[in-house]
Design a protein with these regions (language model features):
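Catalytic adenosine-cofactor/nucleotide-binding cores of aminoacyl-tRNA synthetases and other
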Residues: 81-169
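Short helix-capping/linker segments at secondary-structure and domain boundaries
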Residues: 42-47, 127-137, 195-202
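N-terminal Rossmann-like or analogous alpha/beta NTP/dinucleotide-binding catalytic cores
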Residues: 1-114
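Helix-rich, typically C-terminal accessory recognition domains appended to large enzymatic cores
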Residues: 174-224
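Short, histidine-centered active-site or binding-site loop motifs used for metal coordination
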Residues: 23, 124-128, 193
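Short, mixed-charge aromatic SLiMs
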Residues: 59-64, 144-152, 210-219
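Conserved aromatic-histidine-acidic binding/catalytic patches
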Residues: 25-29, 137, 177
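Catalytic-loop motifs flanking and including active-site residues across diverse enzymes
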Residues: 33, 116-119, 185
């Protein structure tokens, strides 16, 4: 896996073996980014640990965004620190890699206080984490895409089962492994959804497989 180290100003390879990711500060987008990084790393190595430096974001509970409870922890053993602002030296060990996430304007978040948290998660994953979000426009796009994908999965679930498309799964996972390129991973799913040669059952299994990394509740409407 490779990420952009903001402190060194270049792409770096993450070390092999267990990975400790630490979130500094209460930034919501930093927590979402760190969660996807942790999920992606856990699929490629034996263990990935996610900790935080202080209280989680407010007013939304992180569980609403499909981020598991993140325990408080010490950054001293972290290999990656994720933050929305440059942390003080004590909060980011010299050996650690720093992922700086572009923060969300508080006014943008307050205007979306009634939005579904998973829709906001999709909106955040629709843009590179180092670039600004265009809210509420991207939230509207995310809402439409989620609705369309969930309807497709509910339809595909009525078809015979098929093995997932390993090519599409590998392409999406490779995108996430390259500086967490979530927009490219989402584009792979769009390509698969539109592929007339892929069986509905294969599409379903591939979407489910990748949703374990993206955590977008794509199976929500199956059986409804």
């Amino acid at each position: 896996m490779r990420i952009h180290d903001s402190r060194r100003g270049r792409a770096v390879d993450l070390p092999p073996g267990p990975l400790h990711i630490h979130v500094h500060g209460p930034g919501l987008r930093a927590f979402i980014t760190a969660d996807v990084l942790c999920r992606t790393a856990a699929r490629r190595r034996s263990r990935a640990l996610l900790t935080r430096s202080g209280p989680p974001p407010r007013p939304w509970p992180l569980t609403g965004f499909n981020v598991p409870d993140v325990p408080a922890g010490d950054a001293a053993s972290a290999q990656v620190v994720v933050a929305e602002q440059d942390p003080p030296e004590a909060a980011c060990p010299k050996a650690a890699h720093l992922m700086l996430v572009h923060p969300i304007e508080p006014s943008s978040l307050s205007s979306l206080a009634d939005e579904d948290p998973v829709t906001l998660r999709m909106a955040m994953l629709s843009a590179p984490y180092r670039e600004p979000l265009r809210l509420p426009e991207q939230a509207a796009d995310a809402r439409a895409r989620l609705g369309r994908w969930r309807a497709l999965l509910a339809e595909w679930a009525r078809s015979p089962g098929r093995p997932m498309s390993r090519r599409h799964a590998a392409d999406a996972e490779a995108a996430l492994a390259q500086d967490l390129d979530s927009p490219a991973a989402l584009a792979v799913l769009e390509e698969l959804a539109a592929d007339p040669a892929a069986a509905p059952g294969a599409k379903l299994e591939t979407f489910i497989h990748l949703d374990l990394l993206l955590a977008l509740d794509l199976v929500r409407d199956i059986g409804r």
